[in-house]
Amino acid sequence: MHLTELKNTPVSDLVKLGEEQMGLENLARLRKQDIVFAILKQHAKSGEDIFGGGVLEILPDGFGFLRSADSSYLAGPDDIYVSPSQIRRFNLQTGDKIEGKIRPPKEGERYFALLKVDQVNDDKPEVSRSKILFENLTPLHANSRLRMERGNGSTEDLTARILDLASPIGKGQRGLIVAPPKAGKTMLLQNIAQSITHNYPDVELIVLLIDERPEEVTEMQRSVKGEVIASTFDEPATRHVQVAEMVIEKAKRSVEHKKDVVILLDSITRLARAYNTVTPASGKILSGGVDANALHRPKRFFGAARNVEEGGSLTIIATALVDTGSKMDEVIFEEFKGTGNMELHLSRKIAERRVFPAIDFKRSGTRKEDLLTTADELQKMWILRKILNPMDEVDAMEFLIDKLMMAKTNEEFFEVMKRS
């Protein structure tokens, strides 16, 4: 029996399995994690092997637990204990994805324990020992393009195509989506996620939702094929911070194994607010009630995005909230403004006219975009900017959408533009 399979099974099926096949009682009133734990414990009595896996979180005491992505790395009874000797032996770190054989808890124990390590980050455990630490890897400018355009000519693809023209994204990009309320940032993130899973199935995608509404989390889980990790607005700030730390550590471990990872974060403003709440008071308060030391850790999160010379990349596209009426949000945005190497501005004015995507084309852009595009394409993008520059932001967007509708792909659009 495999623990991951049980976690992916709907609760109704788990209750059926436990009550009808294993003779367990009163499962319907338990949390899913408790049901999984009860089924595993019952299964272990029959003497069969049990396999499990998860993402390692090492606690200050030296031992660790394998947390599950399904429960957004929340501590639960179905977590797997990892001993300090195993952590030292395989040079394991927080964020390592581990698979192996597990054993049921003995008398006086509360958790299942890891017996044997079979895989670390989808590689043999021996490979993990010789990898270079993320901090020692050489960061470079993004030079390999992540194209958003799917080429199917749909209205959803229109957003992706405008994104490709306004601010191209590369592997290792550190992007900021600057969004006022109700400008369609969540839909834009969904669109980016769907484009990445469609065009680059080998890229590891993680959508991280901090302080979001529960219904939006469900919608994101159903519309995106990647991993969706969330901490909703009814959770404490410490939980937001723990989730974010787990996600960034997991991404770093994957990059150490030369993989390409993309994190879509909604939103960095709320994450910075959470860090501001949990950071011990330093006595220095900036305007808006932000502690002087509070923004160091969210900056470290955002700053982890990089293209790596030794192979692999970590791309982070985060949304930053503006025009919310909060002085704190303004201060947080100002702090992050110059740190990204790609900015996409959404406009309230365009969204109020019900024109979507509400992208402010003139203010959006990518640094060093010549590394991501061909000289010919770059020339055409500059000509397009010259045409749109004299126009008002709403007119520019409406004009661009009308013209893009005439062609199925951006290449066709440039051909039409050339002829006219």
UniProtKB/Swiss-Prot annotation:
Binding site for ATP: G170, K171, G172, Q173, R174, G175, K182, A183, G184, K185, T186, M187, R213
One record GO biological process: DNA-templated transcription termination
One family name in Pfam for this protein: Rho_N
SUPFAM superfamilies the record matches: Nucleic acid-binding proteins, P-loop containing nucleoside triphosphate hydrolases, Rho N-terminal domain-like
PROSITE patterns hit by this protein: RHO_RNA_BD
Subunit structure: Homohexamer. The homohexamer assembles into an open ring structure.
Protein name, UniProt field: Transcription termination factor Rho
Source organism: Haemophilus influenzae (strain ATCC 51907 / DSM 11121 / KW20 / Rd)
Gene responsible for this protein: rho
